Swiss-Prot record:
Subcellular location(s) per record: Cell membrane
Listed name of the protein: Small-conductance mechanosensitive channel MscMJ
Function: Small-conductance mechanosensitive channel that opens in response to stretch forces in the membrane lipid bilayer. Exhibits a sixfold preference for cations over anions. Non-rectifying.
Membrane topology: Multi-pass membrane protein
Origin organism lineage: Archaea, Methanobacteriati, Methanobacteriota, Methanomada group, Methanococci
A Pfam family hit: MS_channel_2nd
Length: 350
């Protein structure tokens, strides 16, 4: 056993190997204890917080145990100072990165088990649209912080690195200014709420149902099932008609009577229309029925009323019932509706 390798006896090298292998073995034991024994205890609790911690410490604790045993085993070896320094720095990096991994997993668990379910219970869509991108941002910042801390621990000057990142970030921001503008516009839309998911809107020549409000763009499904995607920045600068939030829908139509209709029957026609419209359960005021004009082939009655906004089918059914009732009453009263007609006069030659 007097044989030496790089100044270390075989016995010392064997001690290092045994300690390292012992660290791997104990690390696996700790892993099993965490996964089996502690999990059974934690599963009995009502809170999710301890489950989050359990899920977060699983891998880091194994890495830390193995690293500590490896680091301890090195003490039995004779190594140059620069090698020991490198190993010390490597251990620091491993510990910091393990802590970073724990932090990222912990943040992920807090969002998944607490914040996301909480926002699903709220009435505001802002929470639901912001929380998932926020989770990604927080995790990325945590990873960057861990990497910078690890670099700083081994002697790197992170000030110069941060300055370089600042210049790079500025260039990236300029390249992504449209994306950033759309992102901010998306946040403002969610805060201001000119419309919500499922609303019927008219904007920039598009009309349909809002299917998705994203961070970059909004998607509208038209009534012929075409999907239109509009950047949020354009939406923010446009006039938006929200047809869902109105409490009533306007009906404006013209009913033409034949020119040979007597005045009394014109008055009766107006009475019939107004009575039918006012008595229908789906209608709302104001109700307007007027003899408006002498048309090319008809005496035109202008009819205006409103229908409760309880869906498009409800609106169509109400108009259908009213129109059929008007036709039915006109037939009973002998009131004739006009259709395009022309009178042709023929002049005889002498």
């Amino acid at each position: 056993m007097n044989m030496e390798i790089f100044g270390n006896s075989i016995s010392n090298i064997l001690i290092f190997v045994v300690i390292t292998l012992l660290g791997i073995f104990i690390g696996k034991i700790v892993d099993k204890i965490v996964r089996n024994y502690l999990k059974k205890i934690i599963d009995k609790t009502k809170t999710k917080f301890d489950d989050i911690i359990l899920e977060s410490i699983d891998l880091p604790i194994i890495v830390l145990v193995v690293t500590l045993f490896f680091y301890f085993g090195l003490r039995f070896l004779i190594l140059p100072d620069y090698i020991l320094k490198l190993i010390d720095e490597a251990v620091k990096v491993v510990v910091i990165l393990s802590a970073t991994y724990f932090a990222v997993k912990f943040i992920d668990g807090i969002f998944e088990h607490y914040l996301i379910p909480l926002t699903e219970k709220t009435e505001t869509e802002l929470d639901e649209h912001i929380i998932k991108p926020l989770k990604k941002v927080v995790k990325i910042l945590t990873i960057l912080l861990g990497i910078l801390t690890a670099l700083s621990s081994v002697g790197y000057d992170i000030t110069a690195l941060l300055a370089g990142l600042g210049v790079g970030g500025l260039a990236l921001a300029l390249a992504m200014q449209d994306t950033i503008k759309n992102f901010i516009a998306g946040i403002l839309i969610l805060i201001d709420k000119p419309f919500s998911l499922g609303h019927w809107v008219k904007v920039k020549g598009a009309e349909g149902i809002v299917e998705e409000i994203g961070i970059r763009s909004t998607r509208i499904r038209t009534f012929d099932y075409t999907l239109i995607t509009i950047p949020n920045s354009e939406l923010l600068d446009s006039a938006i008609e929200n047809l869902t939030v109105r409490d009533r829908r306007r009906v404006l139509m013209t009913i033409g009577l034949t020119y040979n209709t007597p005045v009394e029957k014109i008055k009766r026609a107006k009475e019939i229309i107004k009575e039918i419209v006012e008595n229908h359960p789906a209608t709302l005021p104001p109700y307007r029925v007027h003899f408006r004009e002498y048309g090319d082939w008809s005496l035109n009655l202008r009819v205006e009323y409103f229908v409760r906004n309880m869906g498009f089918d409800y609106y169509l059914n109400a108009v259908d019932e009213i129109n059929l009732k008007i036709k039915e009453e006109f037939e009973k009263e002998g009131i004739e509706m006009a259709f395009p007609t022309y009178t042709v006069y023929l002049e005889k030659d002498n």
